[in-house]
Swiss-Prot record:
GO terms for molecular function: GTP binding; magnesium ion binding; uracil phosphoribosyltransferase activity. It holds the Pfam family UPRTase. This is Uracil phosphoribosyltransferase. The keyword rRNA-binding does not apply. Its EC number is 2.4.2.9. It comes from Burkholderia ambifaria (strain ATCC BAA-244 / DSM 16087 / CCUG 44356 / LMG 19182 / AMMD) (Burkholderia cepacia (strain AMMD)). It is an enzyme of class 2 (transferase). Binds 1 Mg(2+) ion per subunit. The magnesium is bound as Mg-PRPP.
Length: 216
């Protein structure tokens, strides 16, 4: 795990396995099936770091030999909220790690001015729940900011929100940080820049199209 001094709320998961798999995702010749599998695997690996600081309490259990007070996650279970549509490919990896998590959805599409347009919000009960928002790309940052806005407007505290993405552009991270400096953003790579079409460079193309085998 490393950080960039420009972005205090950004955490880059630089584990060799994650970087290896991300390289294969970037390859334009990687098949839809392999892209989907790699996205799931990387998200699972990132999930280990994202959940490192979950609150812990103890529970009395009987082992075959003795009774013991053993650690369990405190409070309500996690909620995983993919930003549609590409975020769906990340939710499976997180559910592999935490299969009892609740799942919500936030649907947005990017308008011609690159601003997000919301078309769907479905969330589990919010009280005392820890939320992980997921979307493979933080390009302009507007969709990520909007997703966090959705939760904060419903009085979810910033400390209970984490955003996870595969790749991000510095421009988008800056937008996210300006809007939500109190929310942690985890990525596998901070890429170079956005091009004139607001695509991340080098990036991995359109994550949704590559995930579902569609064309923009």
């Amino acid at each position: 795990m490393k950080q960039d001094s420009r972005f205090p709320n950004l955490f880059i998961t630089d584990h060799p396995l994650i970087q290896h798999k991300l390289t294969h995702m970037r390859d334009k010749d990687t098949s839809t099936r392999t892209f989907r599998e790699l996205l799931r695997e990387i998200t699972l690996l990132m999930g280990y770091e994202i959940t490192r600081n979950l609150p812990i309490t103890t529970k009395r259990v009987e082992t075959p030999l003795v009774a013991v007070d053993a650690p369990v996650i405190a409070g309500k279970k996690l909620a995983i909220v993919p930003v549609l549509r590409a975020g769906i490919g990340m939710s499976d990896g997180l559910l592999d790690l935490v299969p009892s998590a609740r799942v919500g959805h936030i649907g947005v599409y990017r308008a011609e001015d690159h601003r997000p347009v919301e078309y769907l919000v479905r969330l589990p009960d919010l009280e005392d729940r820890i939320f992980i928002l997921c979307d493979p790309m933080v390009a302009t940052g507007y969709s990520a900011v909007h997703a966090v806005d959705v939760l904060k407007r419903r009085n979810v505290p910033a400390a209970n929100i984490t955003f996870v993405a595969l790749v991000a552009a510095p421009e988008g991270v800056q937008v996210f940080q300006d809007a939500h400096p109190d929310v942690k953003l985890f990525v596998a790579s901070l890429d170079s820049h956005l091009n004139e079409h607001a695509y991340i460079v080098p990036g991995l193309g359109d994550a949704g199209d590559r995930l579902f085998g569609t064309k923009n």
